[in-house]
């Protein structure tokens, strides 16, 4: 017999001896407490124990948990069983959940264009950057918790939940451990998981709460204080890693958290009667990906099976019999009496009315088949989607009856308040949310509207509380925390041509008047470019027709190649532009604009030659009409899986505009992505461009992006007219690792200057690549083989393209 089992039997015997000293009419049996530790994704291992408790029908009287243990414990306390929690964990997209912003397809157009272009985004108080209190504000997490706990949000004392529970947190202000026993259950769940620097702290009165695992990751003492006589604890954290295993940022963070509370963890471990420790070797607190989650749950089930003998001993030592939703109570010689009656899950029908409809009273004999019949009759009224019950033994003569209902009818909103909005007016938020008093409360629809408003970029968090008003009415209290009007964005990009390029972008909302926005961006190092844009999309970022004005200065290198594909010179492509126009916006996927532009070109070679005709200098003043249109419903800018990006642009410079060089050019391209069987992605890109014969050389097409064309090097293709097609296959090797196969070819080329058209051969290329998604953005390596020049069909070359970061130009 192993030591933990001996310890459990000894503890149970002591309790039984104590209980035997009580009178035969004693109302009490030994109370069982459940403790679930923190551990990030490792906390999913708790599901194995919860399912084992369900299958053995062991009643839990108290629950205390920290971090992920607090979340699963709270949900178990309000009626989610182990199987339901397993499905919830497996069906949740945890990676998306930990990103605050809506999916790209739901962002407003202007926010969509800024997303995934910069590594760092800061709010600015005045002109000083204000770093966030955590990498994740927890917006989506908060809304998920609110949806899951909605029927119990009117219960303010956690002792009144179906199973009394506690969530453990730490107050950053005082440094004290905080045991949350009342208030909003969803907010308590959010507080206990607020890992410092990862998640923003939660304001709770005068406190700032973070993950309780810092001080008490295995809160056995908390559940003992609640009244537990027997404690079952599941520990998935607080193991100090050896030196050779501390080899990642997550391991360093995990080790740091574990060190702070190691002494209390050791003390609490000794106080547990059943201590279950899943073997999670090789897994980390950050393993929120599908295959890792499955492995963690599997390992948790394995540990629960290993503890099954001890749990069975506990069950029969306490004479618990069949107790969870039973149709028989085998441990009782005669029907026990109902000592307490609790009804949960109702949001519209008052308790008093349900109590009368049920017709069961404390003191009545507990006959499960009779209770089942009453619930069948209750459901037959048409008021309920589902009903159920649990019978929890209290003593050898008494039980507690827990009735669970899920109503057909949803409550109506009696009133709405909004607080925390200092800059955004009540009416603006009220109109954006689109909910009114008298509406039926649909938490899923409410969450969608909140995320739509959140996508505007004005708020750090938006959450809500629901207060029951009785008689199928609730009061909705919405709490917002605004972000400053100013934003600062920082980005880095590296590729084999431009080398390092840095970007600093500034955004100012509501400049002078509500809805007027100013964007400015400076790119420097590998190229120099400044853009500034003043426009009026309105506060809701969806004004169908809006005015804009912009300016741009650009100084970028351009490589010049001869007919053999050899670089013979480089130019500085300098231009200064100012323009104004009107934009057209349809929903968040289609955008078009027309602008009148004045552009000053100053193009000069980087070499000095006595014969200026070889590499001339151009200084031209151009006046242009520019028309652009694009459709964008890609699901991701960095690594698209599905969707279409289509872009059209026309540019014309006419004598009537008093321009130095008249010309016209037009281009269109479509980029289509489709993913099948989750790992296989096919991409089809088609590009077409045509221009007038006298197009100035600085307006030619230059290939400058290996994501469009491989084979030739940067700028080796310089044409008036060009059309090409690209086919790409991408395979996901792991969560952030992809293999790529690429092939492309031109099918139309045209180059005309002073000489007649050249006889051009088509340009082709194929390649293989690896893409890795890192914290700094995608890392791309592509090895290609392809044409060296359109003028020499027999010339081919091998190129290696490397880039990392967020491409912002």
Model-predicted segments: where are they?
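C-terminal outer-membrane beta-barrel translocator/porin domains of Gram-negative envelope proteins
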Residues: 618, 622-757, 794
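Gram-negative/organellar outer-membrane beta-barrel architecture
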Residues: 421-434, 439-626, 631, 701-707, ...
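Bacterial N-terminal signal peptides that target proteins for export
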Residues: 1-9
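C-terminal segment of classical bacterial N-terminal signal peptides
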Residues: 17-23
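Periplasmic polypeptide-binding modules associated with outer-membrane biogenesis and secretion
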Residues: 294-297, 304-493, 505, 519-536, ...
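Patatin-like phospholipase
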Residues: 23-66, 74-376, 380-385, 391-397, ...
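Sec-dependent N-terminal signal peptides
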Residues: 8-17
């Amino acid at each position: 017999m192993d030591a933990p089992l001996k310890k459990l039997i000894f503890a149970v015997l002591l309790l039984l001896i104590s209980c035997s000293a009580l009178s035969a009419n004693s109302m009490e049996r030994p109370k069982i407490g459940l403790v679930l530790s923190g551990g990030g994704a490792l906390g999913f291992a708790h599901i194995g124990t919860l399912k084992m408790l369900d299958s053995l029908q062991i009643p839990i009287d108290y629950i205390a948990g920290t971090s992920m243990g607090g979340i699963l414990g709270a949900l178990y306390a309000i009626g989610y069983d182990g199987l339901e929690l397993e499905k919830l964990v497996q069906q949740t997209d945890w990676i998306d959940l930990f990103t605050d912003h809506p999916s790209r397809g739901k962002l407003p157009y202007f926010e969509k264009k800024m997303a995934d272009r910069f590594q760092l985004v800061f709010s600015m108080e005045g002109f000083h950057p204000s770093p966030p209190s955590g990498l994740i504000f927890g917006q989506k997490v908060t809304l998920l918790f609110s949806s899951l706990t909605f029927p119990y949000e009117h219960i303010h004392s956690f002792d009144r939940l179906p199973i009394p529970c506690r969530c453990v947190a730490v107050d950053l202000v005082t440094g004290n451990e905080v045991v949350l026993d009342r208030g909003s259950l969803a907010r308590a769940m959010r507080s206990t998981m607020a890992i410092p620097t990862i998640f923003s702290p939660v304001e709770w009165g005068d406190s700032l709460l973070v993950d309780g695992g810092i001080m008490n990751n295995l809160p056995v003492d908390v559940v003992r204080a609640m009244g537990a006589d027997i404690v079952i604890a599941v520990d998935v954290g607080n193991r100090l890693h050896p030196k050779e295993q501390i080899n990642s940022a997550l391991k360093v963070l995990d080790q740091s958290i574990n060190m702070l509370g190691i002494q209390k963890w050791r003390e609490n471990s000794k106080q547990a009667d059943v201590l279950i420790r899943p073997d999670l070797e090789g897994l980390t607190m950050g393993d929120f990906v599908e295959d890792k989650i499955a492995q963690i749950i599997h390992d948790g089930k394995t540990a629960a099976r290993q503890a099954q003998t001890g749990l069975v001993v506990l069950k029969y030592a306490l004479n618990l019999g069949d107790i969870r939703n039973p149709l028989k109570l085998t441990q009782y010689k005669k029907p026990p009496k109902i000592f307490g009656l609790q009804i949960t899950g109702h949001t519209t029908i008052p308790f008093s009315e349900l109590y009368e409809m049920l017709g069961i009273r404390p003191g009545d004999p507990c006959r499960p088949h009779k209770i089942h019949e009453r619930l069948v009759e209750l459901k037959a009224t048409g008021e309920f989607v589902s009903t159920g019950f649990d019978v929890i033994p209290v003593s050898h003569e008494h039980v507690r009856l827990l009735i669970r209902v899920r109503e057909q009818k949803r409550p109506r909103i009696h009133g709405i308040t909004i607080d925390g909005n200092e800059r955004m007016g009540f009416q603006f938020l009220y109109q954006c949310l689109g909910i009114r008093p008298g509406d039926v409360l649909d938490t899923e629809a409410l969450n969608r509207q909140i995320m739509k408003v959140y996508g505007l970029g004005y708020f750090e968090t938006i959450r809500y509380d629901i207060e029951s008003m009785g008689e199928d009415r609730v009061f909705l209290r919405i709490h917002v925390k605004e972000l400053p009007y100013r934003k600062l964005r920082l980005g880095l990009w590296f590729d084999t041509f431009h080398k390092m390029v840095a970007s600093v972008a500034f955004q100012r909302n509501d400049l002078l008047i509500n809805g007027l926005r100013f964007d400015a961006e400076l790119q420097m190092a590998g190229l120099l470019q400044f853009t500034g844009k003043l426009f009026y999309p309105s506060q809701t970022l969806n004004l169908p027709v809006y005015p804009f004005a912009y300016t741009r200065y650009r100084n970028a290198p351009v490589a010049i190649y001869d007919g053999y594909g050899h670089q013979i010179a480089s130019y500085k492509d300098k231009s200064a532009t100012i323009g104004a126009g009107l934009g057209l916006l349809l929903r968040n996927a289609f955008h078009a604009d027309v602008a009148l532009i004045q552009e000053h070109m100053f193009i000069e070679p980087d070499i000095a030659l006595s014969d200026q005709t070889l590499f001339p200098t151009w200084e031209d003043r151009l006046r242009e009409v520019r028309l652009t249109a694009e459709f964008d419903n890609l699901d991701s800018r960095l690594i698209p899986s599905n969707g279409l990006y289509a872009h059209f642009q026309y540019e014309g410079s006419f004598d009537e505009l008093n321009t130095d060089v008249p010309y016209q050019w037009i281009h269109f391209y479509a980029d289509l992505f489709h993913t099948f069987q989750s790992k296989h992605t096919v991409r089809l890109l088609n590009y077409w461009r045509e221009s007038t014969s006298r197009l100035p050389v600085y307006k030619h097409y230059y290939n400058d992006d290996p994501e469009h064309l491989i084979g030739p090097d940067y700028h080796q293709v310089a044409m008036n007219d060009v059309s090409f097609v690209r086919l790409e296959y991408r395979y996901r090797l792991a969560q952030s690792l992809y293999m790529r196969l690429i092939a492309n070819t031109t099918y139309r080329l045209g180059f005309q200057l002073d000489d007649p058209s050249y006889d051009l051969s088509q340009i082709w290329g194929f390649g293989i690549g690896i893409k890795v998604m890192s914290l700094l953005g995608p890392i791309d390596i592509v090895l290609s083989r392809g044409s060296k020049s359109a003028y020499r069909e027999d010339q081919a070359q091998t190129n290696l393209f490397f880039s990392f970061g967020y491409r912002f130009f």
